[in-house]
Amino acid sequence: MDNQQDKAIVASANGENTLINGVKENDSEDQDVAMKSFAALEAAAPIQPTPVAQKETLMYPRGLLPLPSKKPCMQSPPSPLGLIEAPEHAANSASVNAISLTSGIAKGLNTWSLPNECEKAPFAIMEPAGMSALNGDCLMQPSRTCLGCFMESKDAVDPEPGISLKVGDLNRDYETCAVSDIGIQCINAGENMKYGEQLLSDQLLGFPLHKSRAGDRRETEKPDIDLEDPAQKSYYEALLLDKCNTEEALLANSNQDWGYFETFISESKIELLDLCSKNELSVNLFSEEDVDNYMFDDDESTLGSDVCSLKIRYESFQDNVRDKTTLLMQEDAQFNFFPSVFTTCPKRESKSGALKQSSDFSQFKVPDVSIIWGEEDKNLDKKKGKEEGQEDKGVEKKDGKDNGEKPALNKPCSGTEVEQLKNPKQGHLANSLETSGSFSDDSSFIEISYDAMGEIKDCSRYMARDTNSGSSSSQQNYGLRAKRKVRYSEDYLYDVDSLEGEKVNERKEWLPVGSKEEDDDEWCPKKRRKVTRKEPPVIIKYIIINRFKGEKNMLVKLGKVDASETTVNLSENQLNKYAKLAPLKGFWQKKKKQRNTNTDSIKTPFSQKQSFEPGSFEVSFLPPARKRKSKLGNRHRIQRIPSIEISASSKQISLCNDQRHASNHKEDGGLKGTLKSAPLGAPSCANGSHLNDITGPDSVKVKAQDTEFKGPERKVLNKIKFKSEARLKSKKVKAAGQESKPIVQMSPLLENQSSKANLKNEVIPGTSNSSRLSEFHEAKAAKSSTFLPTTCSSEMPLSSANVTTNIPVIPGGYLQTLLDASDLSNNTSISYFSHHSPEQNEGSLTQTEKSFVPLQPTQDCVLTSSSDSELQQSSHNFKMESSNYRNVWPNKATSGTQEFMAEVSREIAPTQSSEFGASQVVSMENNLTPTTYNPICLNSGGSNCNKVLYDSMQDTQLPSDDSYQLCHFNNGEICFPFQQGPVNMDDGRLFSFDSMAPLSVSSSNYCSLSLKSCEKDGDDDITDDFLAHCSPKLVIQQSIDEIAPLKESTDLLDISNFTPDKFRHSSLSEMSPPDTPSLSPQITRCESMKTLGTLKGFQEGVPGPLDSVEKIKWDCSTLSRQVQMEDGFTLNNHQFQFHMFNDEDSVSLLQKNPCLSTFNDPSGQISTNNKVSKSRKKSSPSKSGAMNQSSSQKNTRKKSLKGNNKGIEKPPGKNSRQVPKSTKKGKYMAAINGEKMQIGIGRGGSQTNTISSTGKTLAECIQHGGPMASMKMPSQKGLSGDWALGKESSPGWSDMSMGTNTNSLLDDDQREFQEPSYILSNIASGMADVQRFMMASIEPLWEPMEHHGDPNIFYSPESNSLKLKTLKILAGTPQESKKKINSGSQGATKNHRSIKGVSKSNGKTAIGDPGRANMPGYNEDSRSTFFDKKYSNMSTLGNNGPTHKKLYRHKSSSKALRDEKCKGKHMEREQVHKDESGTASFEKLRDSDYNLLKAETTFWVLPVFEEETRIFQKDI
């Protein structure tokens, strides 16, 4: 044990123990082995130190060179070379000692005193521990013990004969160590690595081919071991020279020796390199250089002949690798952990190992096994201990590096070490052969072949097993190296094996190249890198993209938005710039103003601040904005800044505006409200008074903007993000606003109304400003009541409004927010329109004026979730006002359309200006859109009035842009100043967001209208549609009821949807500007004002039909035909639009008219977005008949479906293609929403239009109403009252508008359910849909009542019935599609779907088209939709409303269907986008959609606005 101690000293001194401790059990064992080796070194000290010095100095040419090369005896292959030289005098030279270690042991050189004793004891220790130490040695001298077992046949039969003897000894010491196990013991240190290492050797060294080669090698090795065959020497020379032939001829001996020498040469190079370069460099150098040299210089150098051997060996190895790739790769997979590999290795070990065990054991035992083992093991162990101390440091570094697991593998991986041992031996032998030439290399080789081969033979049990092929040593080495490579890859075996299978040839090449180890080191790391590079980048890529898409554009837009601008001249260009950037900049500016105003209002009335807090940018929105990270918050800032501006404006009208107006902010807001009221009211009124008022309010507006652009605006944005806080505050503000707002708003509103009333008096001369002020106060109170569900519930939806109002109050967190948003979207819109119908009718202007004042607060309100709730409520109020405006406006409108429009314009203008919510309020009040549109229409005679109002807005607040005028008003100087041009596109979306949010209860209708708005954005097809559909809908949910949670949910949903949908988050980002279109509703208002200009005729028709809803619905049916037959966008259409908004706001919101069922909303989305093109086409084909109207609808839809492509194109496509009901449910819902808007606007819209306007106007509008009603149907979604009108026109549609709206929201939500990303929102939306459904079920009579009066519109009783709604909700899209298909009121939707199911749709059209049947134009349009495949495309486009969801669902469900739909939609989208005028009209229609929502809320301005939008979109 002195040797063990010495070896332990050497091992510890040389780091052998530590390195060998790669397998910790090799530590002590390797210490034993190191002691043994050291004792052997001591025994061979006289001889060994010189060779050690020689080897170290000479790179360990033979004996010790392999030892450094392969920490253990692997370096002894030169020792076998030395053995060949000195096997005769094996005990004399260091190489002889090394050779005695190697072959002297095979010869029985018991030079050391540890032949049998230390063999047994130390090597027994080496067997259990010493073999692990040999494993450690195999690690440090892997070619010694493990490779000693493997290579000891060649290098020093030291472990192997020793192991053969030692097999007896080891079997004595370790009964588990059979001869085959001894190789494993050498490999395994006889403990953990017995079977595993032997298996490792068998696997690494012995592949199935190697097994046969191992047998051959055993046979050859037997002669070699028994004799130092000169023939084998010559074979070896021949192998060196002609390895390809001789190695195979040599088979086991020659090949083993050759591969052995070759490996030794390779690893001697490696050892030299390793000794010189500390193994790591050498490994790399040798692997790259020598491997390449060996691989490529096979035939060139002596190593070239080695390389030939290596190549032949490689070829054999290729065979083996083929097996390896098959079996061995499997085994390699097991090799990941050698204990598991042991199972595989013992198989081979058992196979060829048993053969080799007997043969090798007997042979190795019969040779000087005990002497050789003990002595050579001693000498070799000494050498090893000495050189291992050096070489193991380096080589085990190399081995630890190559076999990074080898130190750990040394237990299980002595085969690897044997491989290393063997390869270093072979490499050293080859190097020594190169060094010695062939002379003593041959003799050494033969001796080494005899001894090392005997050793290898014993190891050939497993090693030759492994390398059974002709070149068993090389096969062994390569088998082992290959397995080592595999084992090195074992860490990455899962990767490397596959890569191995891929790179088997490459690996074979690499493997035969010098050192497999180094090939392993190099090759495996490469593979690892590849694997690592492959997977993480993909994952990281998506993660980065998702986050980047979510945040980049938002951040960029936020960055682009100069929040530092306190004062911004809201020129049309700047508004366009802002709108393009995002609503953010102008929104922030407005919010700064608002915050300044809010600061005033907060300073003056805390109730205002409370109210302002929900809408307050400072309190409520600013924290949420920061809370909502830029990804969600910023995009939603973009979305909701406009919508918040608008929604917050209406909410602030109801909330902040009332409160702010109640205080200094009210004074400021009074100016501001006057400003907004003036711009809106002034456009509705005369230009002069408008200009006068605008001048004052413009200054105030600038003031407010200056203030708002400051920090408070960003706080407002933060508050926008802080939806939960905003929502809670919104609820608080609702409570406080309900209580204090009515008072505060009343008195400050009186102030503001004083100025605004004066303004209004100027603006709206025909309208009684006092009553307007009273109405405005009432509307303010009603808006406060908006927060108070029952305060302003003047109509049936009031219960629903109460519920809806209560729903927005529901705090429930994010999910609840989703639920609330969803539920509030439908229910709140119902409740809101019913809620404030009368008060907002008269107070709409007041609210509008106040909205002007709180337009800055509007942002606050919109920013707040409470504002969303308020927005919903205010939307509901708008619907209530819409209903009341049906009552009030018919009087006004009937009295004088101009005056009515002026009133509406004043109301809408202030409301829209104040807030999107105000715009929603007005829009929801059928007055609002007329106000939004009518001020233009009334004062300007339609376009002029719109332009006047718009010009007023331009002059005062906005660059004069008809489209942006309303945006300007809606933004209350803050919203639209930056968003006039793009906001126009986005305004419809914002209208979809906020106006639709109340109409759509911020969820489905919002999504539908948002989709429509998005659909309008042909250019923003994916972006706008997606954001409008995902974000807008969700933003409705968020903006209306839960800005905080739903924004998050929208963002979360959108982001996830974007990511699943091939980065529709790019659309998300793009749609963030579409979300930016939150202002878009304002622009849509402006566009609606433009449309109001077109609404002139609509204004004319508005007054009478508003009250006679059924009558108007009659007219809608009749006049719808006319309008469809005639120009869909005639003044009558505009009037019809105007009235459609009013009626639809009341009915649709309340009843959630069957638009959803009818797919009127998708159609409406299409119509809304396509309204310009579609209504355009309808206008021309309207007269032509159903086909022409269908074509126009189709084309318009195609155009608008461009923007609506996601939402609308998809829903119709979903209607037809949307076979998976649940999958298509949401999308189908979106389609229903769009078609509901179309049909609801077409029918309910035309009905509402008829209600608002005279029957003729309504008829015209209804003709356009098919598309325009569809456009309005998003409103009708939210506007049950409006749909009630629409349902009177098409009772089924009314029912379906309510039920379908509920289902539309439901379907939209279900569509979200379809979306993987929308799961949470789908849950919430589904719950919200159920709630909305129940809410809609609470108010189903609302629409049915309205439709009942209309004989033309046979309201399908189930359409609005709870049963039908329940079925819709339950069936979701299927029920919705059934409704859409089955109910004629779903004409447009069914038309969309009918195009795919014409018979269905025809029946449905007949059913859902009672109004349409009565409304020839729209009915024809429905039928055209049914019959016209263009309209089918439009239906597909109509399904585009949830196109982003469709795209998501594309990924999530019915991919083929969605793909087809998407293809069709995209084609149509492309067509729509290609159609510039269509795109412009689409954008206009999108804006018009917003305006239509407003108009639906207010007047059903949509048809007029459609026409106007068509014109203006063309213009724009």
UniProtKB/Swiss-Prot annotation:
User: What residue stretch is flagged as signal peptide?
Assistant: none
> In which tissues is this gene expressed?
Highly expressed in fetal and adult brain, predominantly in the cerebral cortex and the cerebellum. Also expressed in other tissues but to a lesser extent.
What's the main place this protein lives?
nucleus
Subcellular locations according to the entry: Nucleus; Cytoplasm
Polar residues bias (residue ranges) = 596-610, 1158-1170, 1185-1194
Keywords attached to this Swiss-Prot or TrEMBL record, sorted alphabetically, are: Chromosomal rearrangement, Cytoplasm, Developmental protein, Disease variant, Intellectual disability, Neurogenesis, Nucleus, Transcription, Transcription regulation
Q: Which GO terms describe its cellular component?
A: cytosol; midbody; nucleoplasm; nucleus
- Region Disordered: what ranges? 380-440, 589-610, 1158-1225, 1373-1419, 1437-1479
InterPro entries, per this entry?
A: DUF4683, Nexmif
Record disease entry: Intellectual developmental disorder, X-linked 98: A disorder characterized by significantly below average general intellectual functioning associated with impairments in adaptive behavior and manifested during the developmental period. XLID98 patients show delayed psychomotor development, absent or poor speech development, and postnatal growth retardation, often with microcephaly. Some patients show autistic behavioral features, such as stereotypic hand movements and repetitive behaviors.
Q: What is this protein called?
A: Neurite extension and migration factor
Q: Write the gene name.
A: NEXMIF
